[in-house]
Amino acid sequence: MAGWNAYIDNLMADGTCQDAAIVGYKDSPSVWAAVPGKTFVNITPAEVGVLVGKDRSSFYVNGLTLGGQKCSVIRDSLLQDGEFSMDLRTKSTGGAPTFNVTVTKTDKTLVLLMGKEGVHGGLINKKCYEMASHLRRSQY
């Protein structure tokens, strides 16, 4: 879906994010658009299923993965009306830096953003939420 790439370009434009994706989660979950060569382009249907699934407690204990990147859940309001967001942090491997991640949900899509090193999670959350609100108004 080439038209979705413009949304990714918009999310990446200010330089605060290192990765972004729009993922369809209804029927056959798949990545509609993502930053080429980054983590979110590799998100699997199983990972999407965990994000939107009914079990909201196991990932607090076990974490979850996005495109194979392990993440810790900080706040989960993804299925709550009016909030539709989840805040995560990547898990460090070998002392590497960790990054803030936000996932927001619309009727048909998940919007995912990963901030660059040192970018506050609140900034990522706000940007992700605003894109999801726009998509919701556009019937997505």
UniProtKB/Swiss-Prot annotation:
Found in which tissues?
Expressed in epididymis (at protein level).
Pfam family, any one: Profilin
> Where in the cell is the protein located?
Cytoplasm, Cytoskeleton
Tell me the keywords, alphabetical order. Answer: Acetylation, Actin-binding, Amyotrophic lateral sclerosis, Cytoplasm, Cytoskeleton, Disease variant, Isopeptide bond, Neurodegeneration, Phosphoprotein, Ubl conjugation
Molecular functions (GO terms):
actin binding; actin monomer binding; adenyl-nucleotide exchange factor activity; cadherin binding; phosphatidylinositol-4,5-bisphosphate binding; phosphotyrosine residue binding; proline-rich region binding; RNA binding
Keyword Ubl conjugation annotated: yes
| Entry-annotated residues carrying Phosphoserine | S28, S57, S85, S138
The annotated crosslink position for Glycyl lysine isopeptide (Lys-Gly) (interchain with G-Cter in SUMO2) is: K54
Enumerate the Gene Ontology biological process terms.
Answer: actin cytoskeleton organization; modification of postsynaptic actin cytoskeleton; modulation of chemical synaptic transmission; negative regulation of actin filament bundle assembly; negative regulation of actin filament polymerization; negative regulation of stress fiber assembly; neural tube closure; positive regulation of actin filament bundle assembly
> Cross-link position, Glycyl lysine isopeptide (Lys-Gly) (interchain with G-Cter in ubiquitin)?
K54
Oligomeric state and interaction partners are given as:
Found in a complex with XPO6, Ran, ACTB and PFN1. Interacts with ACTB. Interacts with VASP. Interacts with HTT. Interacts with SH3BGRL. Occurs in many kinds of cells as a complex with monomeric actin in a 1:1 ratio. Interacts with ACTMAP.
Protein's job: Binds to actin and affects the structure of the cytoskeleton. At high concentrations, profilin prevents the polymerization of actin, whereas it enhances it at low concentrations. By binding to PIP2, it inhibits the formation of IP3 and DG. Inhibits androgen receptor (AR) and HTT aggregation and binding of G-actin is essential for its inhibition of AR.
Similarity comment: family membership: Belongs to the profilin family.
- Provide the protein name: Profilin-1
Biological source species: Homo sapiens
The UniProt gene name for this protein comes to PFN1
